[in-house]
């Protein structure tokens, strides 16, 4: 089910206006993109604070209801207070159904505890990555990418190229090589060490 929330047009801008909004329980934000003028908005802090705690909110197509109009967006940036549980600012990007999105989605690791190298071989599995940069059309955007650890052997690694991505989804590599997603490390003397067979990044 698509996440929908309401926003209000923000008229006053600047540091002072933003502080007043935050004191009133509102979060200043902006909607931009899709060859349309940027719109300054405010949203309810309590509502968005709880939505931000949901993993799906960060990797889903969202719907903002603003002054009678609906905007299809993705979350692009969140600014948090350095020590308070307070959201300071939000950036949303409008999306076009016919244009590819570039977004980070979380990785979900399965079968860690049933992996033979963990159960019988005295290994532990190190998760090198927790999210993956992808490119896809909005309709193909997955909430997460599953990483199956069942067959990972001691000293071996799973690389990005080995992930089973949903149809229409591509991994976006930054730089050269094939990044490591997870590695099975042997445990010696209380510390985890890669065996000689470990595949380098």
From Swiss-Prot:
UniProt subunit comment: Part of the 50S ribosomal subunit; part of the 5S rRNA/L5/L18/L25 subcomplex. Contacts the 5S rRNA. Binds to the 5S rRNA independently of L5 and L18.
Role according to the record: This is one of the proteins that binds to the 5S RNA in the ribosome where it forms part of the central protuberance.
Keyword Zinc assigned: no
A GO molecular-function annotation: structural constituent of ribosome
SUPFAM superfamilies reported in the protein's UniProt record: Ribosomal protein L25-like
Bridged cysteine pairs (disulfide): none
Cited Pfam families: Ribosomal_L25p, Ribosomal_TL5_C
Family: Belongs to the bacterial ribosomal protein bL25 family. CTC subfamily.
Stated name of the protein: Large ribosomal subunit protein bL25
Keywords: Ribonucleoprotein, Ribosomal protein, RNA-binding, rRNA-binding
InterPro entries from the UniProt entry: Rbsml_bL25/Gln-tRNA_synth_N (IPR020056), Ribosomal_bL25/Gln-tRNA_synth (IPR011035), Ribosomal_bL25_b-dom (IPR020057), Ribosomal_bL25_C (IPR037121), Ribosomal_bL25_long (IPR001021), Ribosomal_bL25_short (IPR020055), Ribosomal_L25_dom (IPR029751), Ribosomal_uL5_bac-type (IPR020930)
Organism: Aromatoleum aromaticum (strain DSM 19018 / LMG 30748 / EbN1) (Azoarcus sp. (strain EbN1))
One Gene Ontology cellular component annotation held by this UniProt entry: cytosolic large ribosomal subunit
Residue spans crossing the bilayer: none
Record-level GO BP terms: translation
Lineage: superkingdom: Bacteria
Keyword 4Fe-4S part of the UniProt annotation: no
């Amino acid at each position: 089910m698509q996440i929908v929330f309401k926003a209000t047009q923000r008229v006053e801008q600047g540091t002072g206006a933003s502080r007043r909004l935050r004191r009133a329980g509102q979060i200043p934000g902006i909607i931009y993109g899709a060859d349309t003028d940027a719109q300054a908005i405010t949203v309810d802090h309590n509502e968005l604070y709880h939505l931000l705690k949901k993993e799906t909110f960060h990797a889903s197509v969202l719907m903002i209801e603003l002054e009678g109009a609906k905007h299809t967006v993705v979350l692009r940036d969140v600014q948090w207070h350095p020590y308070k549980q307070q959201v300071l600012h939000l950036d949303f990007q409008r999306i076009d159904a016919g244009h590819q999105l570039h977004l980070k989605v979380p990785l979900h690791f399965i079968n860690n505890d049933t992996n033979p190298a963990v159960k019988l071989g005295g290994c532990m599995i190190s998760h090198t990555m927790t999210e993956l940069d992808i490119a896809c059309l909005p309709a193909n955007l997955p909430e997460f990418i599953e990483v199956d650890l069942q067959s990972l052997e001691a000293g071996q690694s799973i690389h990005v190229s080995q992930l089973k991505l949903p149809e229409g989804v591509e991994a976006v590599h930054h730089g050269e090589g094939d990044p490591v997603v997870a590695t099975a490390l042997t445990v010696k003397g209380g510390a985890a060490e890669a065996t000689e067979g470990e595949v380098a990044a």
